[in-house]
Amino acid sequence: MHPHDLDARDEAFISDVIPLMDVLYDDYFRCETELEAEVPAGPVLFVANHNGMTGTPDMFCHMTAFWRRYSPRRIGYGLMHDVPFSVPAAGAWLNAAGALAANPENGRLALERGAAVLVFPGGDVDACKPFRDRYRVGRRGFVRLALREQVPIMPVVSAGAHESLFLFTDGKGIAQRLGLDRRFRSNVAPIGFAFPYGLVLGVPFPHLPPPVKIHTRILAPMRFGLPPSAADDPGIVEQVYTSVVEAMRTAMNEIRQAGRHGLVPASDRAAVVRRARSWLGGLLPVRDRGASPRDDWDERGIA
């Protein structure tokens, strides 16, 4: 496999798999993607929060939304952990789809080609965060890359994919004690539940996610008007990082409050309850209208 080969991206392959991705996007994950502004021509750095352990279903939704809007002719790459490239079937698919091993050099080379580049700065730590932290946005290195290459940043926030499993802990302490960071570049050893394995004990194998609805917002491009040398100033890097993360947190809070994500989105629950009541009503025997003072519960609601 070629996790560092930019020429392995195959436009024809991407065109061939789009129909399958459309089914996952529309029918399985019921993806909803909001675009605040068009993606500018030329190189751009998409910076996204990471969800769903190594299965990362939201990543596929981001890719499909981009291909639909701009077609596979527009060059795009995604930076990811290099371990999946060693999986025989997955490695070839990832290469052809435009995946590259996540490191600053690959990001630089892709941007120099004028590509749109998707990065998940939180890496495996963000992807394996505990369920309670599923709306959290974290980490930094993308700022220096954007400043050095003089490209705009388009933040991407997504909710729903991390509800496809339940992790109690990311197991960072366990990973350090076992030396997983040195052996496999893995900073986590998550513990929780995921289908089809049931209990997840330290090894973040890709899981089979249930059909959770994924709600994504791609924010407008952020430009900072700073020279490349600003990438070497820790104070400036921190300021840029803070502005990006605050924009992402604001958008994430809005998406969270909208409630249009998850296995049964909050915005859909009333309709689901109505359908369930209708279905159950057809199965239950008809009651005498005078039999109970609570026979008008449909009008008054369930206590």
Set out the residue ranges of the language-model regions.
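Non-catalytic C-terminal accessory region of glycerolipid acyltransferases
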Residues: 1-17, 109-303
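Membrane-anchoring hydrophobic helices of lipid-metabolizing enzymes
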Residues: 1-106, 171, 254-303
